[in-house]
Amino acid sequence: SKSLFYQKQYDNINE
């Protein structure tokens, strides 16, 4: 939930 680019599907990947 840090990258604005991967906040679509990878919201729970980099919390």
UniProtKB/Swiss-Prot annotation:
Q: Lineage, please? A: Eukaryota, Metazoa, Ecdysozoa, Arthropoda, Hexapoda
Task: Specify the protein name.
Answer: Unknown protein 9 from 2D-page
Which organism was this protein described from?
Bombyx mori (Silk moth)
